Amino acid sequence: MKIEDKLVTSVISGLKALYGQDVPAAQVQLQKTKKEFEGHLTLVVFPFLKMSKKGPEQTAQEIGEYLKANEPAVAAFNVIKGFLNLTVASATWIELLNEIHTDAQYGIVSADENAPLVMIEYSSPNTNKPLHLGHVRNNLLGNALANIVMANGNKVVKTNIVNDRGIHICKSMLAWQKYGKGETPESSGKKGDHLVGDYYVAFDKHYKAEVAELMEKGMSKEEAEAASPLMNEAREMLVKWEAGDPEVRALWQMMNNWVYAGFDETYRKMGVGFDKIYYESNTYLEGKEKVMEGLEKGFFFKKEDGSVWADLTAEGLDHKLLLRGDGTSVYMTQDIGTAKLRFADYPIDKMIYVVGNEQNYHFQVLSILLDKLGFEWGKSLVHFSYGMVELPEGKMKSREGTVVDADDLMAEMIATAKETSQELGKLDGLTQEEADDIARIVGLGALKYFILKVDARKNMTFNPKESIDFNGNTGPFIQYTYARIRSVLRKAAEAGIVIPEVLPANIELSEKEEGLIQMVADFAAVVRQAGEDYSPSGIANYVYDLVKEYNQFYHDFSILREENEDVKLFRIALSANIAKVVRLGMGLLGIEVPDRM
């Protein structure tokens, strides 16, 4: 039983005994005592002054005396104005640690068969280039969010919508056709997504050269862009694709398959995955159908040019285009089509879209349209909106010199982690295979933690060098502390020390030890809050605060060399449960923690 729950029950009994009145539990406010005051938990007594008919200090004194006499969990109390500060007994903290120790998945709530089904969409790449730094933040946030939502007792389906059609895809197809000379991932030794991305860049290069040449002949920029033979060929290819031209479709399928193989490798390295992948080529026609259905029902209207629109002025928005006059779709049409397919595939209770904040308006509109079209979860659609991520100027430029590929970023992080770990002696005594694995865990952990510790709504700068520091609020600092605790536990096991199911309760704990138990116990509430707020950063910063406190404890107190056997057992058990919570917390963020370093 939580200490807070125990104290709330005793306060209710005390108010009945002292003032003869029943009080609902919701009226009893307990909060953590401020650091400058003595105590662990503070009771606000102002709500009880009417029934006590006394001043706040006297009321607090009377309640404190009652609790001290009748509730074994209260060791002492002090009164500051209208606040009653309660010091929890050491035996009660040890009892709480015993409860946490018996729960291998402390703080994690499993879904039962009646749990709500939450679908989370993230990644959403285009099949004309590799995943880049922006996708890294998206994937890491989406994956962590899915883990956190699942840890709060929900069923979760992780989905991805791949933008696999359109003019941008035709650009890389046409460039490969013109300049590729039959090059394949196998013949070039390149990942498929990188190879296709190179042809997208090649298209852009040739197109710009064409435009410049036409402008030299006297055309304006707009005229030159419209007259570009290369761009017109790409448009023709798109028309052929829409018409189902077998040759164009075969080329499209071949090049997309190269990209998917590349994406799969990137996702695997990054440690993210999906339960279901949707493709825009399958959803956009469904969207058209659903929009026409909405038109027939009078939800939408048609303009003279044949385009279909939604009038959202009643919702405080404007008119929104859903189908162009030539019948071609827009992004909104695709999202409606994808929603239709998803609704047919799964009994969704809530849908969360992990998409950058430049799409805030789009999702506001989508929510209204889905609701109009009869999707029950339309109103409860969540747009998990996040800010942009950049690199410090001049760092890690990609081959194109503009965007940083996810693969290059991860490779550089792993290489830097290996170099830094070797310099600090963290890989001493390990085999080559073990050292490589530690470098991978630390490099990716540094990347993931640095991104996830930041409030998702904020724009951020990812600093590779800063992220691999073994000191401060970083992934490697947390990972090293975890490895340190695992080393303590290994030595304890080698010495034949076994943590009992019930720890001796006859020891006096220090303030630091009580504080650490309180922090470990907080993990369940932190996971719950992160689920309510959709906040991976809440988990990240909690774990950092916990390991920072543990490091101070590790330096200030003997653990294995402690002479009092009961105290030694307690400190080993405390260390084991801190390691457990760190592993669970980092696991929710998709970050591995090494057993040794």
Curated annotation (Swiss-Prot):
Major place of residence: cytoplasm
Enzyme class name: ligase
Keyword terms of this UniProt record: Aminoacyl-tRNA synthetase, ATP-binding, Cytoplasm, Ligase, Nucleotide-binding, Protein biosynthesis
Reaction it catalyzes: tRNA(Arg) + L-arginine + ATP = L-arginyl-tRNA(Arg) + AMP + diphosphate
Aminoacyl-tRNA synthetase found in the keyword field: yes
Gene Ontology biological-process annotations: arginyl-tRNA aminoacylation
One GO cellular component, as annotated: cytoplasm
Domain of life: Bacteria
Signal peptide segment: none
Compartments reported by the entry: Cytoplasm
Ranges spanned by the short sequence motif 'HIGH' region, renumbered to the chain: 125-135
Disulfide bonds: none
EC code(s) of this entry: 6.1.1.19
A Pfam family annotated for this UniProt entry: Arg_tRNA_synt_N
Molecular function in Gene Ontology: arginine-tRNA ligase activity; ATP binding
Residues that span the membrane, as ranges: none
Matches recorded under Gene3D superfamilies: Arginyl tRNA synthetase N-terminal domain (3.30.1360.70), HUPs (3.40.50.620), Isoleucyl-tRNA Synthetase, Domain 1 (1.10.730.10)
Family per similarity comment: Belongs to the class-I aminoacyl-tRNA synthetase family.
NCBIfam families: argS
Subunit structure: Monomer.
Protein name as catalogued: Arginine--tRNA ligase
Species name: Bacteroides fragilis (strain ATCC 25285 / DSM 2151 / CCUG 4856 / JCM 11019 / LMG 10263 / NCTC 9343 / Onslow / VPI 2553 / EN-2)
